């Protein structure tokens, strides 16, 4: 028997996300997942790696995001939060990341790297934990 242990959604690409009790799936994947991304002045989206479309921005992983009334809310490491529709969000993100950025809503091309949905089994997590004993998986 299969059991779902956790459901996660990531409102802003490459930021930590939010645990959800339920999600709605549609053609593009989980509703609201990676619907927003941080974009640099060259038009590349912030990510953990650099590719043709994405640029590595190291401090992204220190931030998390969740939704409040369909608006992404960014949480900073100090616990402070800022809504995506706050006029000061771009200044705060740019200051934190050390470069000028914008918060971009998805347009014609999705913000997904490869796939809109990922299913990770607990056995795969256990396998990874065995190989990385000094890390919390």
Question: Across the structure, where does each feature detected by a protein language model lie?
Answer:
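Electropositive, beta-rich accessory/interaction domains or terminal extensions
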Residues: 1-137
């Amino acid at each position: 028997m299969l059991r779902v242990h956790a459901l996660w959604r990531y409102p802003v690409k490459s930021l930590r996300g939010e645990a959800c009790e339920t999600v709605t799936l549609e053609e593009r994947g989980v509703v609201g997942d990676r619907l927003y991304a941080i974009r640099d002045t060259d038009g590349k989206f912030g990510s953990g790696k650099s590719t043709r479309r994405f640029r590595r921005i190291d401090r992204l992983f220190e931030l998390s995001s969740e939704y409040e009334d369909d608006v992404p809310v960014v949480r900073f490491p100090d616990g402070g939060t800022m809504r995506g529709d706050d006029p000061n969000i771009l200044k705060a993100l740019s200051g934190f990341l050390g470069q000028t950025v914008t918060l971009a809503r998805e347009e014609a091309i999705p913000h997904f790297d490869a796939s809109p949905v990922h299913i990770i089994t607990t056995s795969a997590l256990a396998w990874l934990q065995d190989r990385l004993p000094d890390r919390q998986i």
